[in-house]
């Protein structure tokens, strides 16, 4: 999961639910519109809070693995190391419905910040093989979109760790 740096409480909730659903990675991304959010979740102390929430969610859900939580990254870092076998999705209301997408593991899902991706960011993601997919016509909060997208991908691929990168 490539989640936007956003409101602290929403990020913690998102981390918890993505862990319950079996995400293997949960990477906070500083998108252009992430800069305006306050108080936002970022930094090493916040990352420790995320990991603690994830450990609790792992126990509650009887999960098998704890997601990796790397340091906050920029769009340049997101695009720097593409994996050739990775299915890359970006949530965008103009995309085709995610449920119609042909998926193959591993899958990485980019979630936009409050206010959405800027056109330049979306263009760069598309150029980097991120396929635009939609969760429908409604504009969702980032944490709702992350959980909905991950649940659909997990259901489509099955529940093993090798089938959902997150």
What function would you assign to each model-found segment?
Residues 6, 33-35, 95, 114, ...:
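Short, glycine/serine-rich, charged loops/turns that create anion-binding
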Residues 3-4, 114, 138, 142:
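Glycine- and other small-residue-rich loops at beta-strand/loop junctions that grip anionic moieties
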Residues 10-11, 38, 99, 117, ...:
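Secondary-structure boundary/capping motif
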Residues 82-122, 130-133:
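Active-site/ligand-binding-proximal alpha/beta "capping" segment
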Residues 1-89:
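RNA substrate-binding interface of SAM-dependent RNA methyltransferases
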Residues 119-166:
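Structured adenosyl-cofactor binding patch, chiefly the S-adenosyl-L-methionine
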Residues 73-79, 96-98, 139-140:
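A short acidic, often aromatic-flanked loop/helix-cap motif at beta-alpha or helix-coil junctions
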């Amino acid at each position: 999961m490539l989640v936007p740096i956003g409101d602290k409480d929403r990020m913690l909730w998102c981390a918890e639910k993505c862990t319950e659903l079996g995400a293997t990675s949960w990477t906070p991304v500083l998108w252009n519109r992430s800069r305006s959010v306050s108080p936002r979740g970022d930094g090493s102390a916040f990352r420790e809070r995320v990991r603690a929430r994830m450990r609790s969610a792992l126990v509650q859900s009887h999960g098998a693995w704890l997601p990796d939580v790397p340091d906050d990254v920029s769009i340049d870092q997101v695009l720097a190391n593409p994996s050739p076998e990775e299915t890359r999705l970006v949530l965008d209301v103009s995309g085709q419905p995610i449920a119609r997408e042909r998926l193959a593991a591993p899958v990485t899902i980019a979630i936009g910040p409050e206010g959405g991706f800027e056109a330049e960011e979306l263009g760069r993601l598309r150029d980097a093989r991120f396929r635009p997919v939609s969760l429908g016509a409604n504009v969702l909060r980032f944490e709702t979109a992350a959980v909905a997208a991950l649940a659909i991908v997990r259901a489509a691929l099955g529940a093993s760790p090798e089938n959902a990168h997150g």
